[in-house]
């Protein structure tokens, strides 16, 4: 069965880049800009993994969405994406599984996805 990945990022070109790359590797990638309520989206799509941007352009940050995600599902893997080189949070304390620095080179993200899903 094809694994489903929910990509949440406010930047359209990032969503499209991630979706294209993930689908080329055989995953089913669903995207959101973060403006839709995350819990109904999770109920509808039932992702196996969430790739979540930390800095969204809406009223909520990715960390806010992560808290909502964890209120519904403690077990779904979440990879946080950031444009910042240094991420000053303890992943365990914020309930994330991994984080990656956004880059044109998606090898780090793909490595984490494969580690989780394969």
What residues fall within each predicted segment?
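Conserved acidic carboxylate
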Residues: 9
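His-Asp phosphorelay/catalytic-motif detector in bacterial-type signaling
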Residues: 46-48, 72-77, 89
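Acidic, metal-coordinating helix/loop segments flanking the phosphotransfer/catalytic sites
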Residues: 31-49
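Alpha4 helix (beta4-alpha4-beta5 surface) of REC/receiver domains from two-component response regulators
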Residues: 64, 84-102, 107-111
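Short amphipathic alpha-helix used as the core "switch/output" element in two-component signaling
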Residues: 40, 61-74
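Two-component/phosphorelay signaling modules centered on CheY-like receiver
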Residues: 12-30
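Hydrophobic/aromatic residues positioned on beta-strands within the core alpha/beta folds
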Residues: 79-81
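Active-site residues of response regulator receiver
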Residues: 53-54
